[in-house]
Amino acid sequence: MDLSEPIHDFLLVFLGSGLILGGLGVVLLPNPIYSAFSLGLVLVCTSLFYILSNAYFVAAAQLLIYVGAINVLIIFAVMFMNGSEYYKDFHLWTVGDGITSMVCISLFISLITTISDTSWYGIIWTTRSNQIIEQDFLSNSQQIGIHLSTDFFLPFELISIILLVALIGAIAVARQ
């Protein structure tokens, strides 16, 4: 997207704060319906990040698959549960939550240091081969596959991890 630098920076900060607030809402809100809507906010902000990065196809796939299908499925599953049990005995902080948050924070810090210290361009899967690929001989689905396995490999994998964590969290909330 061709935006001026101050507008682009403002949108990055705005979408980043939306991601942080939505993620906190998924984890901290006691009502699973509100958590599912917060997950929808996180997924929409992620697709808007892709639009800012000029990855329109990945943004459309994010909206259609994750927000349009999976998040709606989670909301339907939560709606069939008994909702009155989530308002009884709600304690914001317990000892187990503190231990879990310390483990999560330490994992997050180790992931951030690993990601920042890694040279992603030296990995063979994130670089294109030296062969010249004729665009005329490839179908659209082959071009999408090449882009997902080269240009958008890291964002695609990060999105899959975020979705996996969200689904595990939804299952954990549904079992309680």
Swiss-Prot record:
GO terms for cellular component: chloroplast thylakoid membrane. InterPro entries: NAD(P)H-Q_Oxidoreduct_6 (IPR050290), NADH_UbQ/plastoQ_OxRdtase_su6 (IPR001457), Nuo/plastoQ_OxRdtase_6_NuoJ (IPR042106). The chain crosses the membrane at residues 10-30, 32-52, 61-81, 92-112, 152-172. It is an enzyme of class 7 (translocase). Keywords: Chloroplast, Membrane, NAD, NADP, Plastid, Plastoquinone, Quinone, Thylakoid, Translocase, Transmembrane, Transmembrane helix, Transport. It catalyses: a plastoquinone + NADH + (n+1) H(+)(in) = a plastoquinol + NAD(+) + n H(+)(out); a plastoquinone + NADPH + (n+1) H(+)(in) = a plastoquinol + NADP(+) + n H(+)(out). Gene3D superfamilies: NADH-ubiquinone/plastoquinone oxidoreductase chain 6, subunit NuoJ. Pfam families: Oxidored_q3. Its EC number is 7.1.1.-. The keyword Membrane applies. Coiled coil: none annotated. It is found in: Plastid, Chloroplast thylakoid membrane. It is a multi-pass membrane protein. Its main location: plastid. GO terms for molecular function: NADH dehydrogenase (ubiquinone) activity; quinone binding. NDH shuttles electrons from NAD(P)H:plastoquinone, via FMN and iron-sulfur (Fe-S) centers, to quinones in the photosynthetic chain and possibly in a chloroplast respiratory chain. The immediate electron acceptor for the enzyme in this species is believed to be plastoquinone. Couples the redox reaction to proton translocation, and thus conserves the redox energy in a proton gradient. NDH is composed of at least 16 different subunits, 5 of which are encoded in the nucleus. Belongs to the complex I subunit 6 family. This is NAD(P)H-quinone oxidoreductase subunit 6, chloroplastic. It comes from Solanum lycopersicum.
